[in-house]
């Protein structure tokens, strides 16, 4: 290979390695805008997501997806009812796993 081809390959490589750290979305923020303190029946849950704090959102976020209509609710992780829900769900999961 001649020097020009090697130089072009090096420049392309350096450019692509710099792109790796750029976020895809400019709207990086917390997922939950408002949170609910209301208790949720574990049987009505389809999915429960716990999102830890990150550089984009300093809060723990708990997102419950309901079986009916697939509605998503953000739950207050500090609420006693939600803490009890998390215990019940983890207890149920531990029964299912061998």
From Swiss-Prot:
Annotated GO CC locations: extracellular space
GO terms classed as biological process: adenylate cyclase-activating G protein-coupled receptor signaling pathway; cellular response to lipopolysaccharide; chemokine-mediated signaling pathway; chemotaxis; G protein-coupled receptor signaling pathway; immune response; inflammatory response; neutrophil chemotaxis
Annotated InterPro entries: Chemokine_b/g/d, Chemokine_CXC, Chemokine_CXC_CS, Chemokine_IL8-like_dom, CXC_Chemokine_domain, Interleukin_8-like_sf
GO molecular function, one term: CXCR3 chemokine receptor binding
Broad class of where this protein is predominantly found: secreted
Keyword flag Disulfide bond: yes
Keyword annotations from UniProtKB, A to Z: Chemotaxis, Citrullination, Cytokine, Disulfide bond, Inflammatory response, Secreted, Signal
Function of the protein: Chemotactic for monocytes and T-lymphocytes. Binds to CXCR3.
Protein name as catalogued: C-X-C motif chemokine 10
Taxonomic path: Eukaryota, Metazoa, Chordata, Craniata, Vertebrata
């Amino acid at each position: 290979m001649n020097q020009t081809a090697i130089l072009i390959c090096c420049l392309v490589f350096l450019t692509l390695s710099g792109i790796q750290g750029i976020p895809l979305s400019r709207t990086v923020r917390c997922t939950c805008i408002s949170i609910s303190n209301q208790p949720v029946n574990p049987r009505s849950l389809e999915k429960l997501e716990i999102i830890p704090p990150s550089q984009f959102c300093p809060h723990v976020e708990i997102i419950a997806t309901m079986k009916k209509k697939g509605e998503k609710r953000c739950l207050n992780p500090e609420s006693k009812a939600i803490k009890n829900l998390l215990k019940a769900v983890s207890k149920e999961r531990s029964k299912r796993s061998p």
